[in-house]
Swiss-Prot record:
Its main location: cytoplasm. Keywords: Cytoplasm, Initiation factor, Phosphoprotein, Protein biosynthesis, Protein synthesis inhibitor, Translation regulation. It comes from Candida albicans (strain SC5314 / ATCC MYA-2876). GO terms for cellular component: cytoplasm. It is found in: Cytoplasm. One of its GO terms (biological process) is negative regulation of translation. The keyword Protein biosynthesis applies. Residues 55-64, 145-155 have a biased composition (Basic and acidic residues). This is Cap-associated protein CAF20. Residues 37-155 are annotated as: Disordered. Acts as an inhibitor of cap-dependent translation. Competes with eIF4G1 and EAP1 for binding to eIF4E and interferes with the formation of the eIF4F complex, inhibiting translation and stabilizing mRNA.
Length: 176
């Protein structure tokens, strides 16, 4: 492919023939957009890389912007944490199809626990039910409340301010 300088291209522009000017206009528009994006990138570089750098312990030039950021978790420092979950294992059937089976979780119904479960159900179905005692220390008292006790908590005699003013003579006698 031949290489031309800008001057040679400008000289050949008058002789050039473009069959579809829309394509040339779209190409020129694309070139302008690329120039704008390059200029924006350079402005961003000037803003963030304005000489505020230092040489770290490994000899790399670094900016100061990373210093105030939060640190990554310990697992993200390059050493992956072990995955403790059980991975699903592919099971291949006789047709050659491989399916992933999820690992079974331990449940109450596994193994010998089935017998215990049946015994527990039989004792509950007998109709007696399970007797549970509430923890009265944390709950209110379970004793029945007598309505007379509730009435005794009420204030039986209302305070009368006028009667108290009239009794000033009685209080003076007590003070002497």
């Amino acid at each position: 492919m031949a290489k031309y300088t800008e001057e040679q291209l400008l000289e050949l522009k008058s002789e050039a023939h473009t069959p579809k000017p829309e394509i040339l206009d779209a190409f020129n528009k694309l070139i302008e957009e690329v120039k704008e994006s390059i200029e924006q990138h350079q402005q961003h570089q000037r803003k963030w890389h304005n000489g505020d750098t230092y040489i770290d312990e490994h000899g790399h030039e670094r900016s100061y912007h990373h210093i105030n950021r939060r640190r990554q978790s310990k697992g993200a420092s390059g050493v992956p944490r072990p995955n403790l979950r059980k991975k699903s294992e592919p099971v291949v059937d006789e047709d050659g199809w491989a399916t992933l089976s999820k690992p079974k979780k331990g449940s109450f119904a596994e193994g010998d626990a089935i017998e215990e479960r049946i015994k527990f159900r039989e004792t509950n179905n007998s109709g007696a039910g399970i007797k549970a005692r509430p923890n009265n220390k944390n709950l209110g008292s379970s004793k029945a409340v007598d309505p007379r006790e509730i009435a005794s908590d009420k204030q039986t005699k209302a305070f009368n301010a006028f009667a108290a003013l009239g009794d000033e003579d009685d209080d003076d006698e007590d003070d002497e």
